[in-house]
Structure formats: structure tokens, C-alpha cells
Amino acid sequence: MNGKRGTWVAVVCLIAVQAAQMAYVVHRESLTFDEDNHMFAGNMMWHTGDFGLNPEHPPLVKLLATIPLLGRNLWVPPLKGRFFKTEAYMDGRDWLARNDGGSQHMVFQMRLAAGLLALGLSLMVFFAAREWFGQKAALIALGLAVFDPNLLAHSALEMTD
């Protein structure tokens, strides 16, 4: 690609392709074992300031993923004073089932919000490669990041692993 404009068009197109891939994949993946308790813990962090439901993982992804839920009047199960892992797991399942049912609309929104981190990572790959190796290498690196199966498979999950 010659010129700055062509490079930026390619970057925007590749990032759009990555976002489209994530949106496509999000609808086809079932919930992981502990994804609902991460979602519930993130929601509780925003509304109560309680970081104790899922303290073994850093809160950034949980908080970012649950931003789309802010302002909604969601049912929250009463905490029963169980061990924090049991509390988050059991209440997370109930919370998601009561508020989202089988539609998985909330899951879709939370996963896409978490996927913003992957889009940011891809842009950082582009900028770092451009700084170190030039524009052509940066576009190649961005293309590799956008179509990397590992990044695609895990980027839109609401996980902290």
C-alpha cells in the first residue's frame, strides 16, 4: 500500500473484519464454565463496590464487560454468605438465567465489550510493528493478529484467563 491514506484504510478494514469475526463467533459459543460468575461479579462490583465475589482474578475485564449493563434494573439474587467461589458460581447462574433467559442478549453485549481489549491489542501490534519495522511489516503483523485463531477464539469471551 502506498501512502498514509491507503494504510489507514487497510487498518480500519482489518479492525472492522476482526470486530465482525468476534460478533459472529460470540453467537456460536456457549457459556464457559465460569463466565457467568465473572459477569455476575463484575455487575456486583459496579453496583455494590464488593470485589469479594471473585477476588482471585483482576477486575478489569469483569468491569469492562459489564459496562453495557449499567443503568439497567436487573434482578440480583440475595447473597447467602457461602464460600465466595460457591456464592459467585451459584448466584451467577441464577442471575444470568433470570435476567437474560435463553436469549443471551446480555451475554452478547458483555462479550463484545470484553472484545474491545482484543481490538486494542491489535492496534497496539500495528503501532509497535510500525515503529520497529515500518509500515508494510505493521500491516502484515496486524493481519496476522486479526486472523489469529487463538485471539479470535478467546477475545470475545468474558474471561480473565
Regions picked out by a protein language model, each given a short descriptive name:
Residues 1-10:
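N-terminal membrane topogenic signal
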Residues 20-37, 51, 73-80:
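Helix-to-loop transition at the C-terminal end of transmembrane segments
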Residues 52-113:
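Interfacial juxtamembrane loops and adjacent helix segments
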Residues 112-132:
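Transmembrane-helix motifs of polytopic, lipid-linked glycan transferases
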